[in-house]
């Protein structure tokens, strides 16, 4: 047992001399490893009489436990010293500004949609939605555009088959709403629409918003007043606005609305008109009792005018240098 005490003393000395965790682990292997000095002491038990083996084994285990505790304590000291050394080596200038958090931002077209929804929401309009894969009845026929009508050719439609298509306008939402509920109706219908066209001012997919009111005694004066208020609110200017006679199959009379630009030229911003009696009849609403007005506008077009963007395609190219300007 005197030899055992000597081993413990030697282990303690080696532990205290270990300068880092790696050196300490070498001491652990030397004394407590599979072939370590203290581990091999267990093999001497077979040379003892059976009645002495339990007591001798307990002494060896106590010695191993003593060394293990010394190893744990020294390891904690070394790890703490290493941490303190790293912290001391680090220099932090607390006068430097913190790292800026990169906040996200809304896409400019989304900003436009939200702004318009907010304005019309205050006038009592609700937001209505519908499918982007539409049938020709809701996209054309019910809107007074039968199969032989030349206006169908103007839409550059993406067809799936003879009756299914990617909607070219959100007017189908108006048809579905009027079929589902009786007047009074007051909705706006924002959403993606699709036309086979691509250049500086057109993309195959773009965003449109249409508005619809159907009630008794709705007149063109109501339409003009609503759109005057909207355009001046949207552009935040006392704009000069004009209504030009135009033609749309689903409204009569129809008009296109222009605003005076900063360059002294008129800029087209939207189309509108009184809901055609045929459209009301197609959805089961009596045009002798009810009347209404509708309007439609391109979200990208309005966004370009509001922010001075010259190329429509910029909205879809995901260029962060462009998008960050609207944060």
UniProtKB/Swiss-Prot annotation:
GO molecular function list: ATP binding; magnesium ion binding; phenylalanine-tRNA ligase activity; tRNA binding
Which InterPro entries does the record match to this protein? Answer: aa-tRNA-synth_II (IPR006195), aa-tRNA-synth_II/BPL/LPL (IPR045864), Phe-tRNA-synth_IIc_asu (IPR004529), Phe-tRNA_ligase_II_N (IPR004188), Phe_tRNA_ligase_alpha1_bac (IPR022911), Phenylalanyl-tRNA_Synthase (IPR002319), tRNA-bd_arm (IPR010978)
Q: Which family does it belong to?
A: Belongs to the class-II aminoacyl-tRNA synthetase family. Phe-tRNA synthetase alpha subunit type 1 subfamily.
| Protein residues bound to Mg(2+) | 252
What cofactor is this protein dependent on? Mg(2+)
Q: Which reaction does it catalyse?
A: tRNA(Phe) + L-phenylalanine + ATP = L-phenylalanyl-tRNA(Phe) + AMP + diphosphate + H(+)
UniProtKB keywords: Aminoacyl-tRNA synthetase, ATP-binding, Cytoplasm, Ligase, Magnesium, Metal-binding, Nucleotide-binding, Protein biosynthesis
What organism is recorded for this protein?
A: Salmonella typhimurium (strain LT2 / SGSC1412 / ATCC 700720)
Cofactor note text = Binds 2 magnesium ions per tetramer.
EC numbers: 6.1.1.20
**UniProt-annotated location(s):** Cytoplasm
Q: What is this protein called?
A: Phenylalanine--tRNA ligase alpha subunit
């Amino acid at each position: 047992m005197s030899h055992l005490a000597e081993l413990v003393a030697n282990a303690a000395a080696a532990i205290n001399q270990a300068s880092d965790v790696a050196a300490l682990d070498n001491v652990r292997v030397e004394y407590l490893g599979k072939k370590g000095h203290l581990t091999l002491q267990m093999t001497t038990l077979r040379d003892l009489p059976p009645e002495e083996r339990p007591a001798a084994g307990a002494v060896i285990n106590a010695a191993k436990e003593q060394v293990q505790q010394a190893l744990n304590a020294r390891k904690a000291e070394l790890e703490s010293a290493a941490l303190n050394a790293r912290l001391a080596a680090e220099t932090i200038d607390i006068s430097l500004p913190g790292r800026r958090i990169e906040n996200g931002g809304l896409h400019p077209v989304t900003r436009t949609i939200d702004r318009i929804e907010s304005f019309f929401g205050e006038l009592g309009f609700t937001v209505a939605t519908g499918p982007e894969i539409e049938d020709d009845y809701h996209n054309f026929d019910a809107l007074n555009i039968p199969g032989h009508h030349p206006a169908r050719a103007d839409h550059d439609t993406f067809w799936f088959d003879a009756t299914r298509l990617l909607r070219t306008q959100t007017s189908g939402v108006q048809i579905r709403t009027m079929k589902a509920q009786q007047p009074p109706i007051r909705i706006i219908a924002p959403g993606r629409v699709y036309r086979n066209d691509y250049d500086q001012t057109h993309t195959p997919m773009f965003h449109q918003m249409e508005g619809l009111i159907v009630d008794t005694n709705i007149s063109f004066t109501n339409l003009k007043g609503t759109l005057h208020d909207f355009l001046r609110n949207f552009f935040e200017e006392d704009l000069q606005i004009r209504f030009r006679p135009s033609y749309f199959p689903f409204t009569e009379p129809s008009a296109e609305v222009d605003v005076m630009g900063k360059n002294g030229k008129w800029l087209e911003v939207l189309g509108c008109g009184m809901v055609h009696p045929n459209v009301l009849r197609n959805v089961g609403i009596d045009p002798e009792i009810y009347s209404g007005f509708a309007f439609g506008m391109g979200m990208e077009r309005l966004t370009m005018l509001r922010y001075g963007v010259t190329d429509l395609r910029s909205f879809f190219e995901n260029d962060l240098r462009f998008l960050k300007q609207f944060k």
